[in-house]
Amino acid sequence: HAMNDMTDKSFDASAKTVLPAPDTTVDVRETFGIDIDWQVPAFSKPDERTPDLDEAYVFDPDTTLAILAGFAHDRRVMVQGYHGTGKSTHIEQVAARLNWPCVRINLDAHISRIDLVGRDAIVLRDGLQVTEFREGLLPWALQHPVALVFDEYDAGRPDVMFVIQRVLEQQGKLTLLDQNRVIRPDANFRLFATANTVGLGDTSGLYHGTQQINQGQMDRWNIVVGLNYLPAETEEAIVSAKNPDIDPKILADMIKVADLSRQGFINGDISTVMSPRTVITWAQNYAIFKDVGFSFRLSFLNKCDEEERMLVAEYYQRVFGEDLPESVVGKSA
């Protein structure tokens, strides 16, 4: 799902955002349903880089306030949580309501310093080949009223982290040595990150390829907020908003299975986890196939490692009281 703006190498460095700066405010109580008197700067119209608005999105109050502080007071905000808690979506949905342009870069996607900063490219000028510097996404974002979101921050390569560390300084200037240029950030440039671990390395070994975020890196983030899995009733509201015809009892049971998978994931028993998105898919498939067990296998079970399927089938059996072909009983039958 990790959307990546980095993959398009032919990035247009001359592109502008629709509006040069926020020109209005948004009332936090009215827009986000959080009981606080606060007007946050916003743009009156969206840009092509403003994320699409999900009307049914449910905001976690603490995380929302942290992200809003990032936008309103130029704080560097990091959102942490397990896989499937919707960290980047949360930042994007806040941005969507502020019409703030947003650029997401997944650091796990083997991004190099050159991708981020830019490269020399050979171009044709009046029929002659000349070398010119092509700006990467980072210099462009810095010079515009854009929220830059680094996803999978804990998986970034050292050369990339070194560049980001410079930008994290409070003045956040970026020096392009090859270019003899210093880029000062736009007054409305914002920086966010999402990370899968608490930066302390991961004791359960769940996230392969994540580095320990060093203390110097962590200290530069002004706000670090933890996003946990949703309370069951919130998740029910989200899934039924997308599947209004579902039987509430079946939905509640689906979420119980999802919770067992999350417990198992946190304990290190399984390596795949059911996110709210998985539950939505399961409910949609159930509407098509009219069979809870079969649609569970299609939506989640078949995505799990073969060794783990028996345990996952057991989660299902515990809640629905039905043995799936993958369960121990099913195997021996």
Give the residues covered by each predicted segment.
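AAA+ P-loop NTPase catalytic core and its hallmark functional loops
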Residues: 4-249
